[in-house]
UniProtKB/Swiss-Prot annotation:
Involved in the biosynthesis of the osmoprotectant glycine betaine. Catalyzes the irreversible oxidation of betaine aldehyde to the corresponding acid. GO terms for biological process: glycine betaine biosynthetic process from choline. This is Betaine aldehyde dehydrogenase. PANTHER family: ALDEHYDE DEHYDROGENASE-RELATED (PTHR11699). GO terms for molecular function: betaine-aldehyde dehydrogenase (NAD+) activity; metal ion binding. It catalyses: betaine aldehyde + NAD(+) + H2O = glycine betaine + NADH + 2 H(+). Pathway: Amine and polyamine biosynthesis; betaine biosynthesis via choline pathway; betaine from betaine aldehyde: step 1/1. It comes from Pseudomonas aeruginosa (strain UCBPP-PA14). NAD(+) binds at G150, A151, W152, K176, P177, S178, E179, G230, T231, S232, T233, G254, C286, E387. K(+) 2 binds at L246, K457, G460. The gene is betB. It comes from the Bacteria. Its cofactor is K(+). It is an enzyme of class 1 (oxidoreductase). Binds 2 potassium ions per subunit.
Amino acid sequence: MARFEEQKLYIGGRYVEASSGATFETINPANGEVLAKVQRASREDVERAVQSAVEGQKVWAAMTAMQRSRILRRAVDILRERNDELAALETLDTGKPLAETRSVDIVTGADVLEYYAGLVPAIEGEQIPLRETSFVYTRREPLGVVAGIGAWNYPVQIALWKSAPALAAGNAMIFKPSEVTPLTTLKLAEIYTEAGVPDGVFNVLTGSGREVGQWLTEHPLIEKISFTGGTSTGKKVMASASSSSLKEVTMELGGKSPLIIFPDADLDRAADIAVMANFFSSGQVCTNGTRVFIHRSQQARFEAKVLERVQRIRLGDPQDENTNFGPLVSFPHMESVLGYIESGKAQKARLLCGGERVTDGAFGNGAYVAPTVFTDCSDDMTIVREEIFGPVMSILVYDDEDEAIRRANDTEYGLAAGVVTQDLARAHRAIHRLEAGICWINTWGESPAEMPVGGYKQSGVGRENGLTTLAHYTRIKSVQVELGDYASVF
């Protein structure tokens, strides 16, 4: 029997029954427990959501900027009041440790919503003088109805990262969470309604990407798609969005990010960064620094320091507040990660630790994989080329700076990169040469609301967070005014 009641769709400011009558299950990856049956949206439900969003958006856009700002700030307050409740639900659905979801997932999502709530009154156009009797002014107008398609690793945070700028700019959003982790996004919809967001401005449709996601990308009344997920799926979403009605897109896609540790680096700091960049959230972070480049002269010392820190990882029940490493998000994903680990062994990478499923006692009921470190890796290995999205670190040895940067850039991805060094000139020189949209010097992983995040190459299109993102949820209307006579040539 499921722990929670059957989960409905959220359309027009309330829960509604899916017309399909079909459901799917969401599972606690820590123990295999069925958390809930979740209703599967149909094409008819997509139409209902779009019509509701069209109507709600008109009401929302007609409000003053200060009115919208106050309502979004109210939603921020509710999110923070309900932080622990939402964190507990996120932990059940994702398997993330409670200590992590309490301090990161809802907190960082609320921060982004607060940031954009403050920017609502600052959305403004320009006045451009042409001559004494004529000028141009511009208006930034909302796009209308936009759609967000989320990933399973940060469900509520991603929903907030996408909905915050969209709603701040006066749009309505239809959001499709991942089938794997749909629960907290439905709670976010409740919170928006409680805060005073008009009915229809934020709708949640649960179901598969192949169906619901496809219907959203094809719909002619949806003006923009914001997608987070794998690169192969992102290409399909982008193609569908373009071929249907030339929709705007934001794509936050895969990564295989390099972390370069230079010979002068503080190795204790470097090891701390490398372990965080690979094992936080059980390695299920798109920006993880999974290709760790270490200078040959420092390899043995660095590996020893990494192993020392891995031994301190507290793998356990996510509900235990002392746990800082939980299961993977699902059993199918666990099998995928284990497959990559076997590939690393077969291709003769040297295994330093981990490399297996954890099955001791109660862990045998969950999707646990031990923190895994491979060394003596080569650039052509599958574990080095492909995104694993799990707790697997690959250590690669290099001999000089040019080699490290050339190899770091030898990838189809360009999401993130980082360097560890005490030489300020070298740090900036290297970062300027690395082909990645998000870079860190002597740190890793923080993505504050003010910071635009997104990738180069096949890691994405557009940005999330920061000032630049808000502009991409608006369109510019240019208006010329003539105060003098009009001279016709006819």
